[in-house]
């Protein structure tokens, strides 16, 4: 496992650990066992269709969760979500992609508080973690798999769920989600593996049965706040199959306002730098500007708790260099960060062009409170 994957593994799990235990200690504990099956999504190429036809995805999943039932502001706003950890494993070792497995943190958010007391309820979920035990591309041993170039990858799963209450202790759940394995172009090829499984699970509450608060919370009125965000991005990038990996990084400056508990939004600038251009193209000469790109970026931060937030960005380049595989005039960003105090934060995002990964941004941020 290389350095980036070690960082990704520890960061993803520590984020969810803090998300679970940093706020309060009152939970309804539960475990769930599930079976899932569904198609691997082809990218439309001949080799992609070949792998899709060869992989009949079937897997087992185990989760341990904690529904937050303390009557706090964020618990109430997110309708008493369930958070926890899970392990997923395919049932078969496929010749083309190996035996994908993952360890992840998850968050399930109901669509309504009233629905939690009904026999049938609905919600949505996200899973974030580390995928491993994949069989990567090899020009001799596995030339067909151009989806993934590394054994260890980032893992994400997003979807919707429906829950049917069997008893006070037991629920049946069905969910549909999009699973994605990617190394963020740290090692090519990296088209990414996408799966669209149906998951059927049995959920069992542990210990005493604790009800969610019956009284609505009087949420304090939110005053408008503003912030300056400084960010340092670091990562690695592989440009061609079999070539070395190079450093990618950058700096960001954003001005944000916080009109509501759940989000901040604003505008800023990003400066990116790409190492290795002289090594990749020794016959050419490059200026500092050739090795950099500059962009205006709109930012939206989804606040999950007082500490955890999801940064989402859409940037437009003022200038860029296509030799650095910045293939479009705009880029997207999404990730997760943990705020250690009112100022310092750390986390990881993925920067992409038209949903095609550019690099994983391991980020250190510093926030300064603006005028109220």
Language-model features: locations:
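Repeated loop/turn-to-beta-strand initiation elements of outer-membrane beta-barrel proteins
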Residues: 71-73, 166-172, 208-211, 261-265, ...
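Transmembrane beta-strands of outer-membrane beta-barrel pores
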Residues: 35-41, 66-68, 87-93, 128-136, ...
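Solvent-exposed loop/turn segments connecting transmembrane beta-strands
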Residues: 54-55, 91-100, 116, 187-188, ...
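Outer-membrane beta-barrel "beta-signal"
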Residues: 194-214, 338, 357-372
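Outer-membrane beta-barrel translocator/channel fold
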Residues: 29-50, 72-77, 97, 114-156, ...
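Transmembrane beta-strands of outer-membrane beta-barrel proteins
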Residues: 29-33, 81-85, 120-126, 172-176, ...
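Residues on the lipid-exposed face of transmembrane beta-strands in outer-membrane beta-barrel proteins
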Residues: 33, 62-66, 105-111, 126-130, ...
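Residues that define the transmembrane beta-barrel architecture of outer-membrane proteins
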Residues: 27, 54-60, 79, 97-103, ...
């Amino acid at each position: 496992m290389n350095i980036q994957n070690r960082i990704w593994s520890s960061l993803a799990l520590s984020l969810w650990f803090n998300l679970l235990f940093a706020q309060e200690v009152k939970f309804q504990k539960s475990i769930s066992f599930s079976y899932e099956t569904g198609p691997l999504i082809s990218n439309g190429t001949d080799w992609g269709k070949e792998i899709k036809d060869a992989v009949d995805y079937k897997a087992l999943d185990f989760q341990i969760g904690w529904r937050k039932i303390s009557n706090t502001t964020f618990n109430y706003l997110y309708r008493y979500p369930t958070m926890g950890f899970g392990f997923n494993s395919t049932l078969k070792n496929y010749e083309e992609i190996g035996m994908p497995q993952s360890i992840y943190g998850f968050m399930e958010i109901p669509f309504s508080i009233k629905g939690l007391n009904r026999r049938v309820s609905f919600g949505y979920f996200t899973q974030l973690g580390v995928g491993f035990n994949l069989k990567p591309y090899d020009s001799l041993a596995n030339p067909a798999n151009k989806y993934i170039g590394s054994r260890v990858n980032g893992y994400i799963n997003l979807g919707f769920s429906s829950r049917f209450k069997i008893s006070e202790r037991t629920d049946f759940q069905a969910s549909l989600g999009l699973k994605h394995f990617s190394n963020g172009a740290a090692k090519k090829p990296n088209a990414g593996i996408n799966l669209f499984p149906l998951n059927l699970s049995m959920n069992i509450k542990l210990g005493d049965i604790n009800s969610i608060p019956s009284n609505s919370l009087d949420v304090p009125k939110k005053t408008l706040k503003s912030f300056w965000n400084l960010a340092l991005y670091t990562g690695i990038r592989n440009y061609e199959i079999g070539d070395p990996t190079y450093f990618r990084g950058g700096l960001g400056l954003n001005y944000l306002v916080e009109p509501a508990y759940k989000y901040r939004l604003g505008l800023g600038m990003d400066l990116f730098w790409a190492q290795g251009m002289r090594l990749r193209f020794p016959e050419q000469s490059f200026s500092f500007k050739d090795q950099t790109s500059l962009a205006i970026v709109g930012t939206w931060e989804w606040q999950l708790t007082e500490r955890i937030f999801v940064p989402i960005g859409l940037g437009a380049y003022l200038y860029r260099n296509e030799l650095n595989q910045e293939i479009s005039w705009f880029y997207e960003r999404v990730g997760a960060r943990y705020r250690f105090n009112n100022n310092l934060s750390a986390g990881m995002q993925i920067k992409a062009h038209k949903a095609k990964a550019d690099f994983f941004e391991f980020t250190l941020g510093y926030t300064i409170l603006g005028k109220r």
